[in-house]
Amino acid sequence: MKVALLGGGVVGSQVASLLQAGTADFAARSGEQLELVGVAVRDTSKDRPGIPAELLTDDAAGLVSRGDLDIVVEVMGGIEPARELILSAIKNGASVVTANKALMATHGAELTEAADHAGVDLFYDAS
């Protein structure tokens, strides 16, 4: 399963570390391999503990537009561009995981409808 991450701050770095460290356990439990294929950040020159530099991109729109993603994890926060990026990921066939309370409170119905229409999942917590 190919995973993209939107946001590489404190939370994003931890999510990236967990995704990379837990691949064997996930594969043993599910029969699927997890592969972190990209992390969208504002500044690719910053050191990001737990995130290999070759995975960093400042082209979030390009990352979520890939047609081969299975899951997009959004940890960037805020309403925009998170909303547009999630809608693009959904349109391109990726399921989405977010803990973005502000986004889900204001656009949860729109995002849920888009995911339902596209036949993908939208998971959220802490919302």
Short names for language-model regions:
Residues 1-92:
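N-terminal glycine-/serine-/threonine-rich beta1-alpha1-beta2 phosphate-ribose binding loop
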Residues 82-92, 99-127:
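Rossmann-fold NAD(P)-binding glycine/threonine-rich loop
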